Regions:
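Conserved MFS/SLC helix-loop-helix module at the cytosolic interface between two early adjacent transmembrane helices
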Residues: 72-112, 319
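Intracellular juxtamembrane helix-capping segments at the cytosolic ends
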Residues: 46, 118, 125-148, 279, ...
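Extracytoplasmic gate region of multi-pass secondary transporters
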Residues: 31, 35-46, 254-326, 370, ...
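Helix-loop-helix hairpin linking two adjacent transmembrane segments in secondary transporters
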Residues: 143, 150-206
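Hydrophobic core of transmembrane alpha-helices in multi-pass small-molecule transporters
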Residues: 26, 30, 97-101, 110-127, ...
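C-terminal ends and interior cores of transmembrane alpha-helices
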Residues: 95-108, 333-349
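A late C-terminal transmembrane helix in Major Facilitator Superfamily
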Residues: 381-420, 426-427
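Cytosolic juxtamembrane N-terminal segment immediately preceding the first transmembrane helix
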Residues: 1-35, 196-206, 230-263
Length: 454
């Protein structure tokens, strides 16, 4: 195999194909994760009309299963992308997504909805969302935060348009027609996104880069072949050699070093994702119960996603200049403040203005968290791109388990206490714990100097 030069290890960092891939990733995330984040509208409809006999925590499992599958199968999906490229992996999942939503329009029972909207569509989104992020990350270096922010804003755009579209169509034409039209939009976005997305490196070139990156691990200079080492030095040299090679745990995690920051980062991802989707799923119900008109309550989800769309772009752009972990620590801290200092008081003294302010503010700061996840992973692995699929998959596994328990546990707290205050308090506490974990990771990587770019 021909050697790979240093310049070939560096991403192209722009060009027509790169920005076309950003657009394709935007469409894929609009139609996959963006549709899933419209869960609050479906939960409100199921609770009030279709499945009133089911509790909030039971209905929360529909979105929870979808989100868990999107990120929980990240390791095999990422490995497939590393081996075969983006399009061959994404294509069958696009077909599955269209079929699963078509079947959703025929569902009548809770378990039918769980299987179609939760399991089948969630699995389909797992094969579109992660590859869409990976291929964008491979194209950019210094502009990575901006590019990923623009691409990931697609999920917020989907979360903005689908709640309005679905709620209006349900009110005017019924559930089945609403699903038919939204399936058409999802299908067109997925197919166009599939055509536009393309990785910068063919699978064979990626394999060569992977081999080159592995050989680039720092090591001591080996003795010449014809020189026999002193027997008295054998014990010392072997111990030094062992210390310069990655530990097994670091190898499994795809890390050369930075193992402690990586673990702290994974804890932060779990805790923040535990809280992330709670307002997306429950805010419309809470707002309606607090006296907000149902039409306006449904739009709170669109407001969150409108704020999130801006929040995914601006923090990503700023992180290219100030550092990914600096901005990540800031936006997760602000997300905890939004939950504990804004939403919790507004719940006990509800006003339409307070609910709207929380929706926009929380959407903005939580959007920054979502868009910075992949740039932070790249920063943790020293900018290597050949194994990004596997590394993103490991991070997504932590995200998946956070999503798996977050919405149902929060819903169970609300069911047990009979009010929503415990749900909001638990979400805020977990978000604060996640922010602390990101701060620990940032300090371990860059020290205590707040001015250093990390």
């Amino acid at each position: 195999m021909a050697p790979v030069s240093k310049t070939e290890l560096e991403p192209p960092n722009g060009g027509w194909k790169a920005w076309r891939t950003v657009f394709g990733s935007f469409l894929l995330q609009t139609s996959s994760y963006g549709y899933v984040t419209a869960c609050g509208v479906f939960t409100l409809y199921y609770k009030q009309v279709m499945l009133p006999e089911y509790s909030a925590s039971q209905l929360g499992w529909i979105a929870t299963i979808a989100v868990f599958l999107i990120f929980g199968v990240g390791i095999p999906i990422g490995a497939l992308v590393d081996r075969y490229g983006t399009r061959p992996v994404v294509a069958p999942f696009v077909a599955l997504g269209i079929v699963s939503l078509g079947l959703l329009s025929l569902c009548k029972t809770y378990w039918q909805i769980v299987l179609c909207q939760g399991v089948a569509f969630g699995l389909a989104c797992s094969g579109t969302t992660l590859p869409a992020v990976i291929c964008v990350t491979q194209w950019f270096s210094t502009k990575r935060g901006l590019a990923v922010g623009l691409a990931s804003s697609g999920s917020s755009f989907g979360g903005l348009i689908f709640p309005i579209m679905v709620s209006r169509l349900i009110n005017s034409h019924g559930f089945k027609t609403a699903i038919h039209w939204s399936t058409l939009v999802v299908g067109v976005c997925m197919i166009v996104g599939l055509i536009c997305c393309e990785g910068p490196y063919p699978p064979k070139r990626l394999a060569a880069m992977k081999e080159k990156e592995s050989s680039a691990t720092p090591s001591l200079e080996s003795p010449k072949i014809d020189e026999k080492p002193d027997e008295s030095d054998l014990g010392v040299s072997s111990s030094i050699e062992a210390s310069t090679h990655p530990k097994p745990a670091a190898k499994v995690l795809g890390m050369r070093h930075n193992l402690v920051p990586w673990i702290a980062f994974c804890v932060g991802v779990f805790c923040c994702t535990f809280s992330l989707l709670v307002p997306f799923d429950y805010l419309p119900i809470i707002a309606a119960e607090q006296g907000m008109k149902q039409d306006l309550a449904q739009y709170t989800l669109a407001m969150i996603n409108a704020g999130s769309m801006i929040g995914r772009i601006i923090p990503g752009f700023v992180s290219d200049h100030l550092g990914q972990f600096n901005v990540m620590a800031l936006v997760t801290t602000l997300s905890a403040i939004a939950l504990l200092v804004v939403w919790l008081p507004v719940y006990y003294s509800p006003t339409n203005g307070g609910i709207i302010f929380f929706s926009l503010f929380y959407g903005f700061v939580s959007g920054g968290y979502t868009s910075l996840l992949s740039p932070c992973v790249v920063a943790l692995v020293d900018g290597q791109v050949a194994n990004l699929g596997l590394k993103f998959g490991i991070a997504c596994l932590c995200l998946a388990f956070g999503a798996l328990v977050g919405i149902p546990v929060s819903g169970a707290v609300a069911d047990d206490t009979g009010n929503w205050g415990g749900l909001i308090g638990l979400s805020g506490a977990m978000m604060a714990l996640g922010a602390v974990s990101f701060i620990v990771s940032r300090v371990k990587m860059g020290g205590w100097n707040p001015m250093s770019k990390v």
